C-alpha cells in the first residue's frame, strides 16, 4: 500500500487549522424542586426574565421569577421527566415563534410547532412573543371598516381596522360564532386581486376542548377560509404556561402582517381562560394574590397584549392589526374583575345575552349595552346614511316596549314605533355561516328604515329579505356593484334602490 506523506500532512494541517481553541461556555443550573408545572432552579445567575431554558429531558421552560437565591421556571410540557438535581441549561433566547405567510392554513401550538400533521412550517423569520406595542407617533386613527358580514354589528357597532372590540357574554351565547362569521366574510376579498382589501385571520383558542378546535378548523376548511387563516391552539389539556403564552404567540404572528403593510384580525378565544392560567402560574410561583385571587399585574397582562393591535400610519406602511378578544361572563356579570378590566382596555364591546339567544334573536347582540367607541368613523358612507336612523329607532323601540307592557291603549304614533321596532329587530337576525356583503346590508337596512317592512307580518320579514336580495343579485347586480365600488349611496343609486325596493314590496304580499 502506497502511503503518500505529503497527502497525509496536508490532511493533518487542514484539520489542525480548523481546530477551535475556544471552549464553549454554557451557564447551567440545578433543579432544586419541581411540581405543579413549576421548577425552582439554582445557579442561573445571569438568566433574563422570559428567557427559554432547557432541561435534561429536552423539555423547555421559561424563567419568570428571578429571585435572590433561585429562579422560578414555568415548564412548557409535562414535568414528569424532570427530577431534582438535574441540570438546566440557558438557551440565551427570549421566547420566540415563527412568523410569515408560511403559517397560513396551519394549526400550531403556543410555541409555533405544527400540530396538524401537515409537515414542518416553512418560515424564514422568527419574532419574540412579547414585544412593546407601537408608540403614539407611528399610529393613525382608525378609519377603514373591518366588515364582519353581520348586519347587527356592521350597522350598529361598526368595527374598524386597528380597533380592539370585545365580544362578551355568557357561555353558549354565540361569541365564537361572531368570530367565525367574521373570518368567513373575508373570503370574497381573498378571491380578488386587491391586496389592500385582504384581511388575514389569526384565531387563538385558549383552554378549549380539542374537539371544539377540530370542529372550528373543519368549518374553516370546508368553507375555504383556512387558506388565509392561522390557528393557534392551547387546549384545556395543555399546561397553564402554554395557555398563558398562546395569545402572545398569535399576536406576534399577526404583527408580521401589520408591520409589512398588510391587514390582519386576531381573535383571542378567550382571555378569561388565559387569565385563569396566569393566576394558576402566579399562585404556584408564590406571587401575592389580589382581587378574586388574580395577581396584581393581570390588568397589565391584557393591556400589553391588546395595545399591540393598531392601525399604522402611512410612514409605517399603513398596515393594521384588529383584535377581537372574547370574554366569558358568569350569569351576565360584567362587573367581575376580568370583564371590567378588558372593557376598560378595549374600544367598545359587543354584549351577547342568553335571554335574547333563547328568544331566537341571533346573533344575540344586546344593542343597548353594546358600543363601538370608534363609531361611524369605521363605516362606509353608504352604511352611515342608512344605519344612522336605525340606532335611534331601536333605542326608542326598547324604551316604548318596556312601557307598552303596562298599558293596552296606545296612540297611533307609539303603535307605529313598536311596529317598526319589532320589524327592525327581526331584520337584524341572521343565520350562522351566511355573512352579507356591505352593499347587500345597505339595501336590506334601507328597506327597513324607510318603512317598506311596516305592512309585512313579522314572521315574513325573513322571506322579504331573501326575496329582495335575490332580486338585487339577479336583475340589479350593477346597482350593487355601484354601491360597492363608490362605497356611497349617491342620489342616483338611492333613487334606483328606492325604485327596486318599492316595486319588490308591491309584488311581495
From Swiss-Prot:
Q: Annotated Gene Ontology MF terms?
A: ADP binding; ATP binding; proton-transporting ATP synthase activity, rotational mechanism
Chain residues that bind ATP: 169-176
In this record, what's one Pfam family?
ATP-synt_ab_N
InterPro entries reported for this sequence = ATP_synth_asu-like_sf, ATP_synth_asu_C, ATP_synth_asu_C_sf, ATP_synth_F1_a_nt-bd_dom, ATP_synth_F1_asu, ATPase_a/bsu_AS, ATPase_F1/V1/A1_a/bsu_N, ATPase_F1/V1/A1_a/bsu_N_sf
State if Zinc is listed as a keyword. no
SUPFAM superfamilies for this protein: C-terminal domain of alpha and beta subunits of F1 ATP synthase (SSF47917), N-terminal domain of alpha and beta subunits of F1 ATP synthase (SSF50615), P-loop containing nucleoside triphosphate hydrolases (SSF52540)
Enumerate the PROSITE patterns for this protein: ATPASE_ALPHA_BETA (PS00152)
EC number(s) stated in the UniProt entry for this protein: 7.1.2.2
* Keyword terms of this UniProt record: ATP synthesis, ATP-binding, Cell inner membrane, Cell membrane, CF(1), Hydrogen ion transport, Ion transport, Membrane, Nucleotide-binding, Translocase, Transport
> Which transformation does this protein catalyse, written as a reaction?
ATP + H2O + 4 H(+)(in) = ADP + phosphate + 5 H(+)(out)
Please tell me one Gene Ontology term that the record gives under cellular component: proton-transporting ATP synthase complex
Question: Which residue positions does UniProt flag as site: Required for activity?
Answer: 370
- Protein location: Cell inner membrane
Tell me which domain of life the UniProt entry assigns to the organism this sequence originates from.
Bacteria
Gene3D superfamilies reported in the protein's UniProt record: 2.40.30.20, ATP synthase alpha/beta chain, C-terminal domain (1.20.150.20), P-loop containing nucleotide triphosphate hydrolases (3.40.50.300)
**Enzyme class per UniProt:** translocase
Give the chief site where it resides.
membrane
**Topology relative to the membrane:** Peripheral membrane protein
Its assembly, as annotated, is: F-type ATPases have 2 components, CF(1) - the catalytic core - and CF(0) - the membrane proton channel. CF(1) has five subunits: alpha(3), beta(3), gamma(1), delta(1), epsilon(1). CF(0) has three main subunits: a(1), b(2) and c(9-12). The alpha and beta chains form an alternating ring which encloses part of the gamma chain. CF(1) is attached to CF(0) by a central stalk formed by the gamma and epsilon chains, while a peripheral stalk is formed by the delta and b chains.
Family to which the UniProt record says this protein belongs: Belongs to the ATPase alpha/beta chains family.
Tell me the function of this protein.
Produces ATP from ADP in the presence of a proton gradient across the membrane. The alpha chain is a regulatory subunit.
Name recorded for this polypeptide: ATP synthase subunit alpha
Source organism of the structure = Methylobacterium sp. (strain 4-46)
Query: In the UniProt record, what gene is named as encoding this protein?
Result: atpA
Amino acid at each position: 500500500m502506497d502511503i503518500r506523506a505529503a497527502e497525509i500532512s496536508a490532511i493533518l494541517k487542514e484539520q489542525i487549522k480548523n481546530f477551535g481553541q475556544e471552549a464553549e461556555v454554557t451557564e447551567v443550573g440545578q433543579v432544586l424542586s419541581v411540581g405543579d408545572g413549576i421548577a425552582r432552579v439554582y445557579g442561573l445567575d445571569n438568566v433574563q426574565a422570559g428567557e427559554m431554558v432547557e432541561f435534561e429531558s429536552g423539555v423547555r421552560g421559561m424563567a419568570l421569577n428571578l429571585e435572590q437565591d433561585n429562579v422560578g421556571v414555568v415548564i412548557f410540557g409535562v414535568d414528569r421527566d424532570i427530577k431534582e438535581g438535574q441540570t438546566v441549561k440557558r438557551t440565551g433566547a427570549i421566547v420566540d415563534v415563527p412568523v410569515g405567510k408560511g403559517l397560513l392554513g396551519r394549526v400550531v401550538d403556543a410555541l409555533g410547532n405544527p400540530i396538524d400533521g401537515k409537515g414542518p412550517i416553512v418560515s424564514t423569520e422568527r419574532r419574540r412573543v412579547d414585544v412593546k406595542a407601537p408608540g403614539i407617533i407611528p399610529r393613525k386613527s382608525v378609519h377603514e371598516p373591518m366588515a364582519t358580514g353581520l348586519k347587527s354589528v356592521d350597522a350598529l357597532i361598526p368595527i374598524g381596522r386597528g380597533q380592539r372590540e370585545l365580544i362578551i357574554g355568557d357561555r353558549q351565547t354565540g361569541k365564537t360564532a361572531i368570530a367565525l362569521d367574521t373570518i368567513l366574510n373575508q373570503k370574497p376579498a381573498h378571491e380578488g386581486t386587491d391586496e389592500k382589501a385582504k384581511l388575514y385571520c389569526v384565531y387563538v383558542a385558549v383552554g378549549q376542548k380539542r374537539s371544539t378546535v377540530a370542529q372550528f378548523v373543519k368549518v374553516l376548511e370546508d368553507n375555504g377560509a383556512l387558506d388565509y387563516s392561522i390557528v393557534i391552539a392551547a387546549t384545556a389539556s395543555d399546561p397553564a404556561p402554554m395557555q398563558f403564552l398562546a395569545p402572545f404567540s398569535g399576536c406576534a404572528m399577526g404583527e408580521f402582517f401589520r408591520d409589512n403593510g398588510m391587514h390582519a384580525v386576531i381573535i383571542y378565544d378567550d382571555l378569561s381562560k388565559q387569565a385563569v392560567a396566569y393566576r394558576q402560574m402566579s399562585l404556584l410561583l408564590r406571587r401575592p394574590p389580589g382581587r378574586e385571587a388574580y395577581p396584581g399585574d393581570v390588568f397589565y397582562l391584557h393591556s400589553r397584549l391588546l395595545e399591540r393591535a393598531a392601525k399604522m400610519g402611512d410612514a409605517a406602511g399603513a398596515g393594521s392589526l384588529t383584535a377581537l378578544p372574547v370574554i366569558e361572563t358568569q350569569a351576565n356579570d360584567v362587573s367581575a374583575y376580568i370583564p371590567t378590566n378588558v372593557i376598560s382596555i378595549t374600544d367598545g364591546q359587543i354584549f351577547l345575552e342568553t335571554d335574547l339567544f333563547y328568544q331566537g334573536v341571533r346573533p344575540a347582540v344586546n344593542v343597548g349595552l353594546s358600543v363601538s367607541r370608534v363609531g361611524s368613523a369605521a363605516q362606509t358612507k353608504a352604511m352611515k346614511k342608512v344605519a344612522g336612523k336605525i340606532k335611534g329607532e331601536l333605542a326608542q323601540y326598547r324604551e316604548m316596549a318596556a312601557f307598552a307592557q303596562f298599558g293596552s291603549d296606545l296612540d297611533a304614533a307609539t303603535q307605529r314605533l313598536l311596529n317598526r321596532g319589532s320589524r327592525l329587530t327581526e331584520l337584524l337576525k341572521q343565520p350562522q355561516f351566511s355573512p352579507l356583503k356591505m352593499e347587500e346590508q345597505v339595501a336590506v337596512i334601507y328597506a327597513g328604515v324607510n318603512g317598506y317592512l311596516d305592512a309585512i307580518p313579522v314572521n315574513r320579514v325573513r322571506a322579504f329579505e331573501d326575496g329582495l336580495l335575490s332580486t338585487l343579485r339577479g336583475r340589479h347586480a350593477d346597482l350593487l356593484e355601484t354601491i360597492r365600488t363608490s362605497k356611497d349611496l349617491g342620489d342616483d343609486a338611492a333613487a334606483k334602490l328606492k325604485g327596486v325596493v318599492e316595486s319588490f314590496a308591491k309584488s311581495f304580499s
